[in-house]
Amino acid sequence: GYSWELPRLASGMSAGLPRVYDIALETISHGDGRLDPDSLARFIIAYQTVTTLTLGELWAIPIMLRLALIENLRRVGARIAHDRVDRNLADSWADQMIDTAETDPKSLILEIADMARSNPPTSSSFVAELARRLQGKSPALALPLTWIEQRLSESGLTIEQQVQAENQHQAADQVSIANSIGSLRFLAFMDWRKFVESMSVAEGILREDPAGAYAEMDFASRDHYRHALERMARRCALGEAQLASLAIALARAARQDGNER
């Protein structure tokens, strides 16, 4: 398929993946899922100060950004689902302890022992949910929280810190999801023709046509020339920008030769 024609990374975390997909992942990560025309342009311009992107890569940016945004939503969704499992576990223990505290307070210590033996997680989602359910209910229900506090202290943490961390995680997830959904909408309305032409190094060189004819062409005609450039670049050792420079140099030489005659 088309993606196999794109340059791929030879090493690193994204080895074997199209280079432009790695760029998309970096772009999404850098802005926590938020995209806008200016930030995207700045990112691509900065990248091209090191490595020039091909026309094919520039045209692939929108689909790669969509994939990166969907991956970001998947990652956040997986984390939320994992946290939900911990919260459900906390709810289950809270239900049992609240019921025992009301019906058989003397057996509460046995419930706490059962929870301790089960080695519950000390994740912020578990701790925050258990604290939310048990705090302020009755003096007896302070016992399981005391055990949790002692368990957390082994890692240098407190219940309050874990509650605060959970609130921050949930807020960050909400922002990331909102940004990603907003960015998917942005991708649908972005003028990608204008973007590719403004970002392409080869395009900028072709517009230096000494006759000024290339810049005056309509988009379809310019695209025809660019496709020819891509085909030639795939068949020789020169890159698109180098071929464009060579074409302009030949055009200038021919124009100068014609003027001299």
Regions found by a protein language model. Give the residues of each.
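A generic short alpha-helical patch detector that favors 3-5-residue windows
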Residues: 12-19, 35, 39, 122, ...
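A ubiquitous short alpha-helical element
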Residues: 8-11, 27-33, 62, 115, ...
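ATP-dependent phospho-/nucleotidyl transfer catalytic cores
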Residues: 1-17, 41-42, 59, 67, ...
